[in-house]
């Protein structure tokens, strides 16, 4: 990335595409030249399902940003999250035999882990590698234990991969727009980079991005993404459940979903004094008695299913037992009424709705529309302390830590 050259980032979502164009000067200060949002077509959960429609909608979004910025992009970085993403943790060990640990020892373990990842998932490509921690003779080291005398060295890493064919389809969609893909960045990683503080990422945080058709989970510790998963379940599934069970239209069901109080206390907005759904919610369907218990049980059943899966994913990492772990919910689904209260009860943790949490902390960096794009900008501009950066530029090299410098990753 050359100083003052225009750079672009586009997030590929189910409902909308979001693009930013920016520059970075010689002092590493970024400047946003333009932003654009357009309707997403041909893309489902980060996957290209119709190349023609996807290319057209991507071209429209990028062109709008280019027109506003009065520039023409040659390359662009992609922010996505797919259920097909795989997050794999590796722990590699090497005998040191009482000698000092050298750079070559760590480089060897990194390459061994990469080799195993490529063998295990031959149809996947690596998009992120994170250093979790080092274990020297049974003791945990957060930083590189160079020049430490030891008998054994273990290195724990997290690899995030995605199907090669999915990458090919994304690249083809951009080629059809006469633009190359610079790099691919996990959306949950980008969100965390933008909206969580370093101490939250250091001591343990769980980010739950609740979307329309999917939910993405990111678990962070020691500034590294230690586990992530995307579930093909979202708040639209609640809408479809209500529609199916209550024989209501999707439009009516969505309106009902948006007015459910997820603390499941008395809801006078949605139900009458006899606890039946109010007549005003029957816009396209004939009025009939639908009890509050039926609608609440439908919503609760789907939310419980989703949260139970998330809870199991948190439990297997052990992060839920760490003192001080924070849980945050973000995304369109986090705006459901009092969902954070229900999540807090379910997990046994204090769950913060991120927009509310930001207000309490007097922070202004949370911008719902472009949050993941701004996080990706930060990652691209500054690098990330625990990540092996794909093909870093000479300007970035000065800022990268030892881990990133000794291991280069190519998609």
What are the residue ranges of the model-derived segments?
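Glycine-rich phosphate-binding loops at beta-strand->alpha-helix junctions
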Residues: 15, 262-264, 322-346
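Hydrophobic alpha-helical bundle architecture
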Residues: 313-321, 325-332, 352-358
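A short acidic Gly-Thr/Ser loop motif
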Residues: 10-16, 81-82, 207-214, 220-223, ...
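Feature representing long, continuous alpha-helical segments
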Residues: 240, 297, 301-308, 312, ...
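Glycine-rich phosphate-binding/hydrolytic loop that grips phosphoryl groups
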Residues: 353-401
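Acidic-glycine-rich active-site phosphate/pyrophosphate-binding loop
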Residues: 31, 211-213, 342-359
């Amino acid at each position: 990335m050359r100083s003052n050259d225009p750079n672009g980032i586009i997030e590929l979502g189910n409902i909308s595409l979001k693009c930013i164009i920016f520059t970075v000067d010689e002092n590493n200060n970024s400047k946003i030249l333009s932003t654009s949002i357009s309707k997403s077509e041909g893309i489902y959960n980060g996957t290209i399902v119709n190349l023609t429609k996807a290319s057209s909608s991507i071209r429209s979004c990028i062109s709008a940003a280019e027109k506003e910025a009065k520039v023409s992009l040659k390359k662009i970085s992609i922010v996505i999250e797919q259920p097909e993403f795989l997050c794999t943790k590796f722990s590699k060990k090497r005998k040191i035999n009482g000698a000092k640990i050298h750079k070559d020892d760590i480089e060897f373990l990194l390459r061994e882990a990469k080799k195993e990842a490529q063998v295990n998932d031959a149809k996947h490509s690596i998009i992120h590698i994170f250093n979790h921690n080092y274990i020297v003779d049974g003791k945990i080291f957060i930083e590189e234990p160079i020049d430490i005398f030891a008998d054994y060295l273990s290195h724990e890493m997290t690899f995030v991969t995605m199907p090669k064919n999915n990458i090919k389809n994304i690249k083809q969609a951009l080629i059809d727009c006469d633009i190359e893909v610079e790099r691919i960045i996990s959306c949950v990683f980008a969100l965390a980079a933008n909206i969580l503080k370093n101490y939250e990422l250091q001591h343990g945080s769980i980010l739950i991005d609740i979307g329309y058709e999917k939910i993405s989970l990111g678990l962070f510790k020691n500034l590294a993404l230690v586990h992530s998963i995307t579930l093909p379940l979202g708040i639209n599934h609640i809408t479809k459940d209500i529609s199916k069970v209550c024989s209501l239209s999707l439009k009516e069901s969505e309106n009902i979903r948006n007015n459910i109080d997820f603390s499941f206390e008395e809801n006078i907005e949605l139900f009458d004094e006899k606890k039946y759904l109010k007549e005003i919610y029957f816009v396209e369907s004939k009025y009939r008695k639908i009890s509050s218990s039926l609608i609440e049980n439908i919503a609760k059943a789907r939310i419980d299913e989703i949260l139970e899966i998330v809870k199991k994913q948190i439990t297997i990492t052990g992060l839920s037992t760490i003192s001080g772990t924070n849980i945050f919910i973000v995304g369109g689904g986090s705006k459901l009424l009092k969902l954070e209260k229900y999540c807090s009860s379910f997990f046994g943790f204090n769950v913060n709705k991120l927009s509310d949490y930001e207000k309490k902390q007097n922070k202004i960096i949370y911008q719902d529309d472009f949050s993941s794009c701004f996080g990706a900008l930060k990652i691209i501009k500054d690098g990330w302390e625990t990540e092996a950066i794909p093909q870093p530029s000479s300007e970035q090299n000065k800022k990268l830590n030892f881990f990133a410098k000794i291991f280069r990753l190519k998609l």
